[in-house]
Amino acid sequence: MSYRSFVHSIAIASTIGLAPPAWAETPALPAAVSHQQVPDTYRFPLGKLDIVALSDGTVPQDLHQLLTHTKPAEVDDLLHRSFLDNPVEASINAFLITDGARRILVDTGSGQLFGPGYGGKLVDSLASIGTTPEDITDILITHIHTDHTGGLVVDGRRTFPNATVHVGKPDIDFFLDPSNAARTGYAQKYFDEAAKTIGVYDKAGKVKPFADRATILPGVVATIHQGHTPGSAFFNVTSEGQSIIFVGDIIHVAAVQFPKPSITIVYDQDPTKAASVRQTAFAQFAGDRQLIAAPHLPFPGVGHVRADGHGKFGWFPVEYRNRAGQ
């Protein structure tokens, strides 16, 4: 299924608040069945940094509708191997980095834009660790899709009034120019949503675009990997010889795209490049034993990639720790 035909088929509502956005877009979300959890966080150190994974919630996903360069039977087989069935549940993760001087968010979840019951839990997760929106000094946006920028606003106002938003210049140039919708065929609603989220900060002078390989904050280097969007970014964060890379939407479904990285998703602006980026990055992460964090892997979305041969990979979450001692 092509991106254009998929968008045409679902006939989404024109009102932003009713439109199912980027990663959470499905033909119809089922009536909400409660799987409510207490605010979810997972804290771990990295050198002198304190990092907290924050849950913005989860959403159900019909992979038969969303995944491309595959067939439903193949998807079902891969899911079966991981004891899963379609539809699956997708995590929406954000991350807080504290270095003593700054409180830095990586992505902001979906905010109000998925509708009641789906996402929008980031502020509650922050509150559970004693952090308010006003405490946030910087926000690193991996790419401009609503499940990463939706939490930037509440009722049209900036959720994080003191924060500077850092985002790749190619994404700014693409999504804040609505003429690109007609030129490329990418759905108009993504541009509308960008204007209502990242655009609010841009008008306030609170957006700092970055180029590839830019050091955007001390110990934070951004690299741009075109494919999912024109300005999709990784953030390599280092402290005292340790590092973690925040990888954005290089991966959506662990059970499917780790064993078969060539499988893409309808939201990829350039699916061929997105698949190539994924294959190359997975191999590098595995070879380097690199710790990574991803917004749509099962919460907390932090762990390592292992090369399993023949272009296949496996995912290994960090071990769970819950103690005060060293």
Where are these regions (language model features)?
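Histidine-centered catalytic micro-motifs
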Residues: I139-T149, H225-S232, A293-P300
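Active-site metal-binding loops of divalent metal-dependent hydrolases
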Residues: D56-G57, T108-G111, I144, P170-D171, ...
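Divalent metal-coordination and catalytic microenvironments
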Residues: K48, I97, D107, I136, ...
